[in-house]
Amino acid sequence: IERENIFLSIGRIQQQKGQLETLRFLNSFKEIETNFMCYFVGGPSGSSGEEYLLELKESVKELSLDSHVEFLGNLPQVDIRNILNKAKLLIHTSQYETFGLVAIEANSMGVPVLTTNNGSMQEIIVNEENGYLVDGLHYQDVNTSIKNLINNNQYFEEVMINCMHKSKDYRWENTVDRLLDLYQEAKFS
């Protein structure tokens, strides 16, 4: 599968989702690689969503990321799927995430995830297997790995296969089977 050097950030535009951290990563990353584009998919949400979007757009200018970042707003699911099929990385910097469904969806389409090592994400993402976990927001630690991911097709294909395999753990039938096992275990304990 031939993919482009596209990064994605998918989710509502609000501080909780941490898109400003994504911009900080991109600013750090462009120091070692300039051949990439990051699309932000999702519209402003909540009382401060519009204000946060303006802050993000200002940061894009201040960080000289104009040629690397585009805000696409809300898109139909079919369009999100199409862009995921072209992407090489999902950047997920949400500060609080009870369950990272977007990460599983990206993995199911062969897209690795760069995320923070907190909450449920550390259960979904296995570092350097189906994505990259960073402590806090120290993205410099993964810049070289991400550069390798987008420039080494053989490595990308290995990670892509890992992503698709890992996402199968979260198929509904597997989830139901695990839930039934838990009930059986509780029943006979």
Model-inferred region functions:
Residues 74-75, 82-87:
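Short alpha-helical donor nucleotide-sugar binding micro-motif in glycosyltransferases
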Residues 127-128, 132-139, 148-153:
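Conserved acidic donor-binding segment of nucleotide-sugar-dependent glycosyltransferases
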Residues 1-17, 23-26, 39-41:
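Conserved donor-binding/catalytic core segment of Leloir-type glycosyltransferases
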Residues 95:
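Aromatic "clamp/platform" in nucleotide-sugar-dependent glycosyltransferases that forms part
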Residues 103, 112-115, 125:
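Short hydrophobic beta-strand element within catalytic cores of glycosyltransferases
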Residues 10, 37-57:
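Glycosyltransferase donor-sugar binding loop
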Residues 53-75:
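Nucleotide-activated donor-binding/catalytic signature segment of Leloir-type glycosyltransferases, i.e.
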Residues 141, 148, 155-169, 181:
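A short, well-ordered alpha-helix in the C-terminal region of glycosyltransferases
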